[in-house]
Every structure is written in structure tokens, then in C-alpha cells.
Amino acid sequence: MVLSNVKIFRLKSHRAFRIGPMIKAVAGNLLVKRFYQPKLERIPPASLLLKQKIRLAQNGSTTSTENPISFSQTMSEIFSVLQPSAPDLDEDETSGLKRDHLLTERLNNGELGVIMNKFFNPSSTHNNQLIDTNILLQNFPKLSGNDLDLLDFAINEKMRGNWNDLKQDFIQLWYYKSFGFLGPRTQFVLTNSSPSLRSQFLKLPFIEYNWFLLQNNKNANILPADVQNVVKVFHLDDKRFSWKSIDPFSKAIISFVVFVSIYVWLDESAKQKTKELPAQKSTVISE
């Protein structure tokens, strides 16, 4: 019995000695997997992310019937029955993702460079120079809707990166697309503009006047020979509050408020004087 017990104890100790290192190795691997996460050096491309979004959106629409019916789903189904012509949000999201994916592929394929070389002087675009103004004004209206969509998408994508890496012709095209030939200027009105300015006081639709023409009624005497030498000089100043820049209705309201304030002040001062007189008489009688 004693020998058998000694053998059993030796077997158990030998097994424990063999199992101990295995447990330590497994525990070490778990700790490494738990606290160590390798860094991915390569970022997935945008086209792959868009494809994944489209696939997830389509899978979500197909598997939504398998999930338990929620209150929002039942309400959306009821409204879809009541309004069959209403747009489907899932379809709109999927179509938007497909459109972004298509524009990303067009941008990665270099279609924007082809458009710029076709319409805006290829020699200047390769040398990273500005586009000629006459060429820009003549050829920009020739761009189709698809070309403008690609340009807008490229602007939204490239503006997120470093602006120092952008070419001069692309910056010029971006500027012209955003502001036109006038630039980001305020209070800039052309003399030959047909639409008249509306009064901003309460946005009255029945009162219209061209305030710019009222301020510039002076006739300029220019000889026909000097017309070619005339340079249009536009005076651009900051927005300042002045009495001349206020429309007549605002002037009337301000004048009325000032008149009422003066009247109330005079009335209150007169009442104060009438109250002070009996007080003075009472003090004199008491003395």
C-alpha cells in the first residue's frame, strides 16, 4: 500500500510538472492577444469602404424582415401604405453610396485631369500655372452636368487634405466654381442688373425700389473715343451703419420711437415737477 501510494504521488507530481508550463504558455498567449493589437500600416481605399457600405446597406434591407418587428418599422410601413409616392430612405441612401462610389472611381481613373486638359489649355495645367482668364470664361459653361458633379466631388474630397499639395489650376477652378468672376465680395451690385432690390423691412413684397440707382443718378459725359480707355473701378468698403443707408420705412420707425421716447420723458418730468411743488408748499407751511 505504501509503495502504491508513493507511485501515485510521483505520477501526479510528474503530470503537474508537465501541465504547469503549458498553462503558463496559454496564459501568456491570452495576455498577448488581450493587450497587444498590431497596427495596420496600410489604410483600406475609399472605394473598398464604399463597397462595404453598399453591401451592408443591402444586407440590412434584406435581413430586416428576419429581425423582430419594432414600433418604428411598423409606423414606417403604415406611412408607406398611406403615402405610396413618398421616397424610400433606404433606397436614397443606397443610391447615394453608389453615386459616391462611381465618382470615386472616376476621380481615381484621372477623369478630372482629362476634363481640365480638354477644356482649359493643357500646356498651362501640366506646368502648374494659372488658367487663362478668357479660356476659363469661355469653356467653363461648356462643362456638362456629369463634369460639374465630378468637380464638386473632387473639391469636397481634396479640401480635406493638405491645400499646399493642390495645383494652381485646380485652386483657380475651385475659386471660379464657388464665387464666379466677381469673387467673394459683399455689397457688390452691377449697374446693368435687371432685378431690383427689395426692402428688407418686414420683407414687404409690394414695395420695390432700386436703391443702387437712387444713389447713382449722376450722368457721366464720356466721349465715344474714350470709351475703350474707361476702366471699371468698384468702390468696396466695409459694412457700416449710416443714416443714408437705411431704407425709408426703417427711418420712419426709428423716428417714431425717438418721438415717443421724448414724449414719455417730458411727461414723466412734468409729473415729477407737479409732485415736488406740493411737497415744497408743505415744508414752507410747517416752518
Swiss-Prot record:
Keywords assigned by UniProt, alphabetized: Membrane, Mitochondrion, Transit peptide, Transmembrane, Transmembrane helix
Subcellular location: Mitochondrion membrane
Transit peptide boundaries: 1-24
Domain of life: Eukaryota
Membrane topology designation: Single-pass membrane protein
Primary location recorded for the protein, binned into one broad class: mitochondrion
Any coiled-coil regions, as ranges: none
GO cellular component: mitochondrial membrane
Regions crossing the membrane: 250-266
Similarity-based family: Belongs to the GEP7 family.
Task performed by this protein: Involved in respiratory growth and required for cell survival in the absence of prohibitins or GEM1.
Protein name in the entry: Genetic interactor of prohibitin 7, mitochondrial
Organism from which the protein derives: Saccharomyces cerevisiae (strain RM11-1a)
Lineage, highest ranks first: Eukaryota, Fungi, Dikarya, Ascomycota, Saccharomycotina
Designated gene of the protein: GEP7
